[in-house]
């Protein structure tokens, strides 16, 4: 079974499962997905999140995926050894219907922390009505995923507010996302001057601009299939202050096409934003860190070298 089909099965399975919802205190562990022992989910909102959307049931976790997220959290993974001072907020993919929170989340954090980079895994809200990728409905399905973007903005501010406590450099905090999470990377990279919620505490005085951005097989950036015209919701917000960006996609990606990365690449180049694009002939979609004989499986090493060239970690 292909990786994309496998994740689709995970999402459908999770949607069919039911669980008992327990009322807990704000700082208690939420029901649904749980991180590995030794790590704690931190609610990113002190109370109810803004723009709450209805979901069909309680948060449900199955086979490495999670659905019906209404209570967003961040989980911090710190390096055991050498610390570079850099941090990456990770956005798993899942079409804004669910989150591949292990495949494109905890496994990614294991890799990053092994390189001395602090990883902050964001369990952002899904589904994010009206932005739910349930079909290939471009060009109509180009809305900004407001609840998810609110969560991303808030998390970047929280990470900066804890920089001293977590031994981070406030100027080395970036984002990495896959598929829908890759689209969220482009949103937070271009909407950092657009506040989408009312400030709730002192952390919201911090900047939500990423210092660097990494989008792996991002989706819904091109206006149409076989077109490199960029989604105007993103294009209209690109400026010279958009952070340096790393893009990667395969030509045989039949879920989110190569034009998604190409269109964003061209938009960034037009604004003189430093950008690096890696395009491969084969590899499909949703491959994460899975090893293969294909060249694309070496993408983590490319990211590490790129982070060194832009001064985020030691080359």
Residue ranges and their predicted role:
Residues 147-234, 240:
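Primarily recognizes the serine-hydrolase "nucleophile elbow" in alpha/beta-hydrolase
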Residues 254-260:
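Conserved alpha/beta-hydrolase "acid-adjacent" motif
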